[in-house]
Amino acid sequence: MAKLDANSEFEKGRALSVPVVKVPRSVKEWLCIDRAYENGNFKIEPMTGEAMYDQSYMFEDINYVNKDTAKKDSTLLEIMTLLKSLDGPFKITLANEQRDLDSFVNEIFNPINGQEYPVIEKGIGKWINQKIDEGTRDIRKTMILTVTCRAHSLEEAEAYFATIDTTLSNIFRNLRSRIYKMSAEERMVLLSRMLRAGEECLPPARISPHDSGWKNQILPASIQSDTDYMVINNKQYISVLVGTAFGQSLSEDKVIHSLSDVLFPTYITIDMQRVPKNVIHDRLENAHANNERV
């Protein structure tokens, strides 16, 4: 027998978080983070009692870099499959970040050993020039996992994330990879890099859950919005695309690879929400009975 409320129960899994400010009146109010703690935990929603908290981790995924194209396409999906063992919602962000050219050259081409290894120095110099000509010099890939939970206090959220740390370590060990828990400073630098592409990004001087002044230190001076794009600091244009349904002919791994293998800054976020088995069963039962549109 079909369940009349199957669709509504299924859609509850896609509920949005409560914004800190319903209608932002300044750039500072635009960032939906209620409180930040030095250990890297962020309180996302403003209410007292049960609220949303999250924690971010960075992939130190050497294997991903070294894989061929076919393997790269499937690695992200393999990780997502394993992470389905987590109880709460999570998201994976694949960031193509713009970096400063001088920093890139200093990192790759260190002239200290130039006199000792002149042939190697010359070869690296040619390689750098080749990369500059190709236009790939200022893009780097970063993979971020953000885990979310609902808790009545910071202590309750920290206890949950402590168990998650062990689970994630085991998952990535099986993938022959590593994962690194990010501090508040590191998360803020990441946010700043996204909003101030190509500029030097420094962590806030002071981080306190009772002081939101850190937002002014990482956010741009101005954000203007138009119909289908935003302008940051009158020079950086941002467009946001949201995909909620995909044709069966599309291959997930190829879509992800195509969107991420580009020569300009992009941030691809894949949101995952666990749905109870009984809700999925009712939803499929209704679809089979053709009583609801799916």
PLM feature spans:
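Extended, folded cores of ATP/NTP-driven motor/assembly subunits in large transport
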Residues: 1-294
